[in-house]
Amino acid sequence: MKTIVFVGPTLRAREVPFEVRPPAGVGDVLRASRERVQRIAIIDGYFERMAAVWHKEILVALEKGIAVWGAASMGALRAAELAPFGMIGVGAIYQALSRGVLTSDDEVAVAHLPGEVGYRAISDALVNLRWGLAAAARKGVITARTRDALIELARLPFYRERSWARLLADGRAAGVPSRQLAALAAWPKPDQKAADAR
């Protein structure tokens, strides 16, 4: 059973035990649907440098009887939009999008390097910052008030400029308590996008 996975900055290709393709752009799912494939999984996709994968091409794949899954990033966005038509969403990010808890495409967007160097992310997704702050508050690393203030600060920069380092600097400038920022800086940050993709 052939499975094609569109993945880039969320997971390294060697972590995926199926046929790997670059992040999905317009036309990629349509081309894949013309192959002898039974399953297509969309994790990563393009937002800006090229047109995003179209809803219609996913619908064409579904009409051909190909199971189409989505998780973590562009896949979660498209799965939340196309679940009524049979696309299968996976993971906490998909659930948050499908329930309307998250509503913006830029929640999952990251800047990344080209494929020749493995699509390594060079910014942090807002959803990962949000999940990390929520987890830190649950563990008592920061207070709920600090969590809320930092989430608001995390939303302000353009997605290419979002990072934990930027968020901590913005928090210092905004007067967030320094002890909490120091504790947060030392705390291991979860990667919800990668967790959903796995």
Region locations from a protein language model:
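Acidic/polar N-terminal loop/beta-strand segments that form early-domain functional surfaces
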Residues: 6-8, 43-46, 71
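Catalytic-core regions built around general acid/base machinery
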Residues: 53-66
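Buried hydrophobic packing segments
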Residues: 58, 77-78, 132
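General beta-strand structural signal in soluble alpha/beta enzymes
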Residues: 21-22, 41-42, 68-72
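Gly/Ser/Thr-rich loops at beta-strand to alpha-helix junctions
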Residues: 11, 47-49, 74-76
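Accessory terminal and edge-of-domain segments that mediate assembly/interaction
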Residues: 1-39, 50, 55, 112-198
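Class I SAM-dependent methyltransferase SAM-binding "motif I" and its flanking Rossmann-like core
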Residues: 74-75, 79-113
